Structures are given as structure tokens and as C-alpha cells.
Amino acid sequence: TEGLVLRQTKYDEWDKILTIFTRNNGKVQAIAKGARRPKGSLVAGTQVFSYSDLLLYKGRNLYQVNQADIIESFFSLRAYATHIIELIDAGSVEEVPNTKLFDLSIKALKVLSKLNKDYKKLLVAFELKYISFIGYRPHIRSCVVCNNELHNKIRFSIEHGGAICENC
């Protein structure tokens, strides 16, 4: 299954416990045995920010990573990618698939890797889609106070749950 490694924790001498956001199973905890060995076959595909094709087996308490082939790494973008990954981790539930959020996350990281600037615009766009996908959709089509059409100067009101026109 395709997965994005969100977190890793050292476990024993050569192993690590991973939090992986997968397309098919949602967020899962998995053990990657030998993933900390310098020449281990799981090293690259189990790094944080790695988007990998994973062979996972469900154990009693954890999944086990038996194979990890890296599709793409977003390590060089770690400052911005960390923000995206933290949101995914906070907004996903263990073993509850959310393919829309998975696809959005991978797409955002791929676009981020190709940008030279305007990272903040991408992050804001991601955040707006993200909050919609996890069930919080702000009203941005018209003013939440008077329902008039929105023009150039608008403000966002957390209290009202959406955009407010310049007259309100």
C-alpha cells in the first residue's frame, strides 16, 4: 500500500516504530525491524517525509513493514512539510481510511517540491482543503453576516465561521 511516513520512534537497537498515513488503511502504527541498520533494505523507505510503496502485515498490536520502496522523498522540504505532516497526523484517525486527505497530502507535497517560492500560498490552500476534509468547512462564498457577495477586501472571522465583507 502507498504510505507517507509521519513519525518515527527508535525501538530496540535496530528497529523503529512508525506512524504511517496510508491510502487504504488510514493512519497506522507499524514496526520496521532492522530499519535503523545502515545497510538495511528498509532505511530509505521508512524515513519521515518518505512517500513509499509498503508491504504491511497486520500483527496483534502493530503492523509490520516487510518491504518499503521509496516513491518520493520530501525530506528537503522539511520545514514546510513538517507543517503538512503534523496536520495530517492530528486530523487522521487510526485505521480509518481518508483517501481524499491522502491524495491531497501527496499532491501538496509534490507541488511544494516543485515550487521556488510562494510556499505560504500553497500551505494556506492546503489548510483550507484540509479543514474541509476533516469536517470543518468555513463559509467563504459570501459574507457570513449579511450574505452579500465578497469583493477584494475581506476578513476572516473565526467567531462567525467564515468571510466577512468590508461593509460589516
Give each language-model segment a name:
Residues 1-168:
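Non-catalytic alpha-helical scaffolds and adjoining flexible linkers that form interface surfaces
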